[in-house]
């Protein structure tokens, strides 16, 4: 069983906030697949269903962001799940709007919802961070995070949520890099490029393969004999 927890704040006042992109992501998955209607349990809104043949619980904590771990932790204890059975989806200030990153474990990065999850659920769960961009100055962060998405944001927000919902079964199959590539391509970016070769495999710095070939195949000139005498007459000795 896998729990997919979207983080956010409950109530209509916060529904369109950037801080609630985790709720929006889980709602998109719920709409796209055959999940039960939302119900209340574990201090949260929950819905049950299947993705990729595995049972999945969608959860939106109703405790407010700072106490998200209370709800998710209660659900994990009820189902006897481990941190590896949890995916948390939440907003990330330090990623450009529309970018996504998915990894296991790590720090909370100042995110209070993740601080709470770390305390109640352990740290080795998968974290899907969805970029909302940074306003540029620290003083504007709170208004930015708790502000609603602008209409212009739909240009990246809709394809991001649609692609995540369409490919949510990849979360079940642990196809994390493939999912990130699909999201990047949907947003007009590039898939992850091939990793650079190891130093031992690289060509010598500053030399093309042609130059290397020349260096390795230079002919040896005769030092004595008639040919050497002729070359000396034509070109002279080096250093003269």
From Swiss-Prot:
Keywords: Cytoplasm, Hydrolase, RNA-binding, tRNA-binding
Protein name: Peptidyl-tRNA hydrolase
Chief subcellular location: cytoplasm
Enzyme class: hydrolase
A GO CC term attached to the entry: cytoplasm
CDD domains linked to this entry: PTH (cd00462)
Organism from which the protein derives: Rhizobium etli (strain ATCC 51251 / DSM 11541 / JCM 21823 / NBRC 15573 / CFN 42)
GO molecular function, one term: peptidyl-tRNA hydrolase activity
Keyword field contains tRNA-binding: yes
Gene that this sequence comes from: pth
Region entry Disordered, spans: 190-240
UniProt: tRNA binding residues: 14, 64, 66, 112
Biological role: Hydrolyzes ribosome-free peptidyl-tRNAs (with 1 or more amino acids incorporated), which drop off the ribosome during protein synthesis, or as a result of ribosome stalling. Catalyzes the release of premature peptidyl moieties from peptidyl-tRNA molecules trapped in stalled 50S ribosomal subunits, and thus maintains levels of free tRNAs and 50S ribosomes.
Residues at the active site: 19
Keyword Hydrolase in annotation: yes
Ranges annotated as biased composition (Polar residues): 209-219
Pfam families (alphabetical): Pept_tRNA_hydro (PF01195)
Enzyme Commission number(s) of this protein: 3.1.1.29
Catalytic activity: an N-acyl-L-alpha-aminoacyl-tRNA + H2O = an N-acyl-L-amino acid + a tRNA + H(+)
Swiss-Prot/TrEMBL site (Stabilizes the basic form of H active site to accept a proton) positions: 91
Any GO BP annotation: rescue of stalled ribosome
Localisation per UniProt entry: Cytoplasm
Quaternary structure and partners: Monomer.
Family from the record: Belongs to the PTH family.
Bias-annotated ranges (Basic and acidic residues): 190-204
Site (Discriminates between blocked and unblocked aminoacyl-tRNA): 9
Classification via HAMAP family: Pept_tRNA_hydro_bact
């Amino acid at each position: 069983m896998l729990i997919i927890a979207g983080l956010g704040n409950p109530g209509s006042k916060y529904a369109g906030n950037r801080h609630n992109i985790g709720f929006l992501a889980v709602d998109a998955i719920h709409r796209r697949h055959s999940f039960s209607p939302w119900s209340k349990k574990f201090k949260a809104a929950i819905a049950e269903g299947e993705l990729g043949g595995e049972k999945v619980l969608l959860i939106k904590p109703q405790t407010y962001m700072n106490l998200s771990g209370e709800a998710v932790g209660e659900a994990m204890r009820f189902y006897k799940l481990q941190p590896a059975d949890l995916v948390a989806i939440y907003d990330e200030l330090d990623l450009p709007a529309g970018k996504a990153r998915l990894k296991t474990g790590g720090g909370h990065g100042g995110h209070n919802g993740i601080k709470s999850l770390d305390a109640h659920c352990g740290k080795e769960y998968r974290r899907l961070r969805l970029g909302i961009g940074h306003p540029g100055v620290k003083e504007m962060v709170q208004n930015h995070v708790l502000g609603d998405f602008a209409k212009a944001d739909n240009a990246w927000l809709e394809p991001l949520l649609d692609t995540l919902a369409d490919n949510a079964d990849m979360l079940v199959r642990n196809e994390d890099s493939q999912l990130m590539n699909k999201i990047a391509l949907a947003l007009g970016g590039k898939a992850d490029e091939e990793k650079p070769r190891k130093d031992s495999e690289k060509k010598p710095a500053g030399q093309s393969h042609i130059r290397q070939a020349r260096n390795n195949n230079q002919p040896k000139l005769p030092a004595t004999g008639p040919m050497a005498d002729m070359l000396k007459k034509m070109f002279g000795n080096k250093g003269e």
